[in-house]
C-alpha cells in the first residue's frame, strides 16, 4: 500500500473517531432531501428522522445496479419485489422487505465488491440500517427470510435486465435455479417502472404491509 493511500486511510479512521465522539449539534452535518408533508427538507446524519414520503422519492429515483441494467430499474421497485416474495414465497414479514434497502434513500446503491474496499461506507450504512430498524420496529438484523427473498429478487432481475443475464453472479445459497423457475413458470418479473410510478407503488406497499 502506498504512503498516500495509507495516509488517506489514516485520515478516514481519525475522522470517523472524531465523528463518534463529536460534540457537534444535530444541525451538523446534514444533507438535503425531498421535503415531506411538513416541509422538512434536511436529513441530519447523526440524528436521522425517517420520513416515508421522502424515502420513497429518493429510492424511486435511485437506480439499482448503479444504472448498468438494460433499463432504468429503481431501488423502490426492487424493495416491493422483495416484500412480495416474502409474502408469497419465502415467508417472514414483508414490511422488512419494503424497508430492507431504505438506507439507499440516503446512500447510493454500491456494489458488494466495492463495499469490501470501503469500510467507512459499510460502517455508515450499518448505522443507517440500525436506525431504520429501530424506528420502524424491525428485527435487529436482516432475517434469513428477507435475505433469501433479496437473493431471489437479484436473480429474477438479472435474468431480465442485466448483461450476461446474471450468469456470472455468485450463488452462495443455491437460489439461482429457484429464482429462474419462479420467473419462467410462475410469472415473477419486473416492470422497470418510471420513477413516479415506482414511488407510488412503494408508498402503497409501505402502507399495506405496515398494517397487515
Model features per residue range: what roles?
Residues 2-212:
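Metal-dependent phosphohydrolase cores
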Amino acid at each position: 500500500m502506498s504512503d498516500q493511500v495509507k495516509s488517506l486511510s489514516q485520515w478516514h479512521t481519525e475522522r470517523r473517531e472524531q465523528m463518534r465522539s463529536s460534540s457537534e449539534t444535530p444541525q451538523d452535518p446534514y444533507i438535503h432531501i425531498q421535503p415531506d408533508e411538513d416541509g422538512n427538507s434536511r436529513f441530519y446524519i447523526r440524528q436521522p428522522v425517517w420520513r416515508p414520503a421522502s424515502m420513497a422519492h429518493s429510492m424511486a429515483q435511485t437506480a439499482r445496479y448503479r444504472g448498468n441494467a438494460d433499463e432504468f430499474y429503481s431501488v423502490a421497485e426492487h424493495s416491493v419485489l422483495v416484500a412480495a416474495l416474502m409474502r408469497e414465497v419465502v415467508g417472514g414479514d414483508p414490511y422488512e422487505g419494503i424497508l430492507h434497502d431504505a438506507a439507499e434513500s440516503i446512500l447510493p446503491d454500491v456494489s458488494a465488491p466495492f463495499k469490501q474496499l470501503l469500510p467507512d461506507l459499510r460502517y455508515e450504512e450499518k448505522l443507517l440500517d440500525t436506525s431504520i430498524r429501530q424506528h420502524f420496529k424491525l428485527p435487529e438484523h436482516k432475517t434469513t427470510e428477507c435475505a433469501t427473498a433479496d437473493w431471489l429478487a437479484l436473480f429474477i432481475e438479472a435474468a431480465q435486465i442485466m448483461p450476461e443475464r446474471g450468469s456470472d453472479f455468485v450463488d452462495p445459497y443455491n437460489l439461482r435455479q429457484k429464482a429462474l423457475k419462479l420467473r419462467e413458470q410462475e410469472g415473477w418479473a419486473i416492470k422497470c417502472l418510471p420513477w413516479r410510478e415506482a414511488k407510488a407503488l412503494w408508498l402503497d406497499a409501505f402502507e399495506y404491509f405496515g398494517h397487515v
